[in-house]
Regions:
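A detector of single, family-specific signature residues
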Residues: 1-403
Length: 403
């Protein structure tokens, strides 16, 4: 029984090797995440004839190189949640923290929980790439929000008031009508310099050229807002540069989002559960691939409850003495992306209640609303039910595909 504790950091790891009762075979030592350095470690481990467990924390992407290398060498690698390891480490009155101390504690953890059942699913390349694309989409969407705020602050000085008139970014087409409009009509005077009739004609021509549906009421509304607005920047070349530069950057981000989502759909279509997931109500070409990417193989969760806990929407019981908590809040200990997807999914079901009549998730949502639950409480209660159905259906499909 030999426990290898790995304290992972960027580019290197501090490694300690222990046996039961605190016998230290190797004191903490640093190894770079390179094949030559890790080969020295495996050469030393190969000399042992006892069973070896390697334990490390899940630290974003830092642990992936050493974990992949050791798994390739057929070592039993156990990746532990950092929160669980932190609670294990902080049991004393004094809690010093260094890489060496952490490596010893992780190795000791491996001995204390040696016989704990551990399930390790190895994803294929398609799922790994899909997960990476899903993370990239999430980060790029954050960038888009920042760029939208920048553009909005500029529009408030050049063409205030048009925020809710024009459509925003469309995930399905990759188009953004509002940013396209302000790129060409970057200032209120670029609209009011024409008569209303002349602007409507020009707006119709612009809509046709850009591939948007023309609406005369929309054109008149834009003209009215521009005429009544109070711009605080002049219609100069400098203002034009500021607006168009902000739009140009936003377009590049939009194009990146569209390309990522398109590629995610292409990869997801090659997976056996794609059709089953896309048939579920509320799931479209935007949510579907991202949901598949984030959950991965649902069979890695021992039950639907584990999947719900992974999403962080579980409500753990709380009881002490004669008190039993009945109104519990979500733990929010899981994936933020899963909760974001859950909100998007349930928002779609909420908006299309008539179309989804008879769907068990939609019916459950409406039942909770009828009980007087707040909208978001009902939404995540229904999302809980959705994940139970997802786990059952997709696991069944994947099991059949193996036969």
């Amino acid at each position: 029984m030999i426990s290898v504790g790995v304290d992972v950091s960027k580019g290197k790891s501090t490694i300690c090797i222990l046996k039961p009762y605190g016998e230290m075979i190797m004191s903490p030592k640093d190894y770079e995440h390179t094949q030559s350095d890790l080969k020295k470690l495996t050469d030393q481990l190969d000399d042992f004839e006892e069973e070896i467990h390697v334990t490390m924390e899940s630290t974003g992407n830092y642990h992936l190189p050493i974990a992949a290398y050791l798994k390739k060498k057929n070592y039993d690698v156990r990746i532990v949640n950092p929160l669980e390891m932190k609670r294990y480490r902080c049991q004393g009155l004094r809690n010093p923290k260094t890489d060496s101390i952490d490596a010893v504690m992780i190795a000791q953890y491996g001995i204390d929980f040696w016989f704990r059942p551990f399930r390790d699913y190895v994803d294929d390349n398609e799922r790994i790439e899909l997960k990476a694309l899903g993370m990239q989409y999430h980060k790029t969407m954050k960038t888009r929000k920042d760029r939208c705020l920048v553009l909005e602050s500029i529009i408030d000085r050049t063409l205030p008031g048009i925020g809710g008139i024009l459509n925003d970014y469309d995930k399905h087409t990759g188009k953004d009508k509002k940013s396209d409009f302000v790129y060409d009509f970057y200032h209120a005077e670029k609209i009011t310099v024409h008569s209303e009739k002349r602007f409507c004609a020009r707006y119709a021509s612009w809509s046709k050229k850009k591939g948007y549906r023309y609406s005369e009421d929309e054109a008149r509304q834009l003209y009215s807002i521009a005429k009544d607005s109070i711009p605080t920047l002049p219609p100069s070349e400098n203002t034009k540069l500021i607006v168009q530069d902000a739009v140009r950057i936003l377009r590049e981000v939009d194009a990146s989002l569209y390309d990522i989502l398109t590629r995610m759909n292409e990869i997801a279509k090659s997976l056996p559960e794609y059709t089953t997931v896309m048939e579920m109500k509320g799931v479209g070409i935007s949510i579907g691939p991202r949901l598949i990417a984030e959950i991965g193989d649902p069979r890695r969760f021992h039950s639907a409850k584990a999947l719900i806990a992974y999403a962080g929407i579980d409500a753990p019981p709380y009881q002490s003495g004669r008190f039993t908590g009945t109104e519990r809040h979500m733990s929010k200990r899981g994936s933020r992306i899963m909760r974001k997807l859950g909100f998007e999914l349930m928002d779609a079901i909420n908006k299309h209640q008539k179309s989804y009549a008879g769907d068990p998730v939609c019916e459950y949502f409406l039942a909770k609303r009828a009980e007087g639950k707040k909208c978001r409480v009902a939404m995540f209660a229904a999302y809980n039910k959705f994940l139970r159905i997802y786990h059952s259906r997709v696991s069944s499909v994947l099991n059949e595909s193996v036969k």
